[in-house]
């Protein structure tokens, strides 16, 4: 379980999170949605311990984040940021194996190979990470996070992803979310991601959190949260919300 109580954070006089309280029990994919500047990435950084709020508290497994050592926290949660640039010429395989850093044991070649296959990175193994496309880098970063959290097995782990599909083609978007569902169901992973694609959230998330101007304005199942009234008010766009005939999830369509 991860929880946030009364999170407040301001920067240059602007409230980026405004008295945010949330509890995620785990065993699900959570999508945080909202317009640009809503506070989504700021909230994610607070939930992961990378950003200390001005007031309020985050807990992981009922223990305050500031009471975890850096190493122990890294064994229980991993974070993909929006940008993961590197200045030095590491190969893809070397970048992925960096996920082993919190663990005392060395590189596990079989484990790394398995995860590279899961993330469709085998053909990239010997390439310079800096020369990859944005989508290829996102796949490599996901593999690095999985190496970081893969053991001990099984045990509850949290995976935080900030716009993980921003550079992925449609095939790899589908592949990513099918993999995340598999990890949730088979390996006790819990997933929290910031997304802009409403239909991906509607199709794959178990829970959706809507944010606006630093506040959480809705939190629940996609079919309860992603309504035409709520989304029109939140985004100011002309949309229609239909029902996907395949799985009855919301289907958001832009009006002409």
Swiss-Prot record:
Q: Which UniProt keywords apply?
A: ATP-binding, Cell inner membrane, Cell membrane, Membrane, Nucleotide-binding, Translocase, Transport
Under the heading Pfam families, the entry gives:
ABC_tran
Q: Which GO terms describe its cellular component?
A: plasma membrane
Q: What is its EC number?
A: 7.6.2.-
Q: Where in the cell is it found?
A: Cell inner membrane
The membrane-topology field of this record reads: Peripheral membrane protein
Keyword ATP-binding set for record: yes
Q: Where does ATP bind?
A: 34-41
A GO molecular-function term, please? ATP binding
Q: Which residues form the ABC transporter domain?
A: 2-238
Briefly state the protein's biological role.
Answer: Part of the ABC transporter complex HmuTUV involved in hemin import. Responsible for energy coupling to the transport system.
Q: Would you identify the family this protein belongs to, as annotated?
A: Belongs to the ABC transporter superfamily. Heme (hemin) importer (TC 3.A.1.14.5) family.
Q: How does it assemble?
A: The complex is composed of two ATP-binding proteins (HmuV), two transmembrane proteins (HmuU) and a solute-binding protein (HmuT).
Name of the molecule in the record: Hemin import ATP-binding protein HmuV
| The species this protein was found in | Escherichia coli O6:H1 (strain CFT073 / ATCC 700928 / UPEC)
């Amino acid at each position: 379980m991860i929880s946030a109580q009364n999170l407040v954070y301001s920067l240059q006089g602007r409230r980026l999170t405004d008295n945010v309280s949330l509890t995620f029990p785990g065993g699900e994919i959570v999508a945080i949605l909202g317009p640009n500047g809503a506070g989504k990435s700021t909230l994610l950084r607070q939930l992961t311990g990378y950003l200390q709020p001005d007031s309020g508290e985050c807990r992981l497994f009922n223990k305050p984040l500031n009471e975890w050592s850096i190493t122990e926290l890294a064994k229980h949660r991993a974070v993909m940021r929006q940008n993961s640039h590197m200045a030095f010429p590491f190969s893809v395989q070397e970048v992925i194996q960096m996920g082993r850093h919190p663990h005392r044991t060395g590189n596990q070649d079989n484990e790394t190979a398995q995860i590279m296959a899961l993330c469709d990175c085998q053909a990239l193994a010997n390439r310079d990470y800096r020369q990859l496309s944005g989508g290829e880098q996102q796949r490599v970063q996901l593999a690095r996070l999985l190496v970081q959290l893969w053991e001990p097995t099984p045990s509850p782990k949290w995976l935080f992803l900030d716009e993980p599909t921003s550079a992925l083609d449609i095939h790899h978007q589908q592949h990513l979310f099918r993999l995340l569902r598999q990890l949730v169901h088979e390996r006790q992973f819990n997933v929290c991601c910031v997304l802009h694609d409403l239909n991906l959230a509607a199709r794959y998330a178990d829970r959706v959190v809507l944010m606006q101007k630093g506040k959480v304005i809705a939190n629940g199942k996609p079919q309860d949260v992603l309504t035409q009234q709520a989304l029109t008010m939140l985004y100011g766009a002309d949309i229609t919300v239909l029902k996907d005939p395949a799985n009855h999830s919301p289907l958001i369509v832009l009006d002409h």
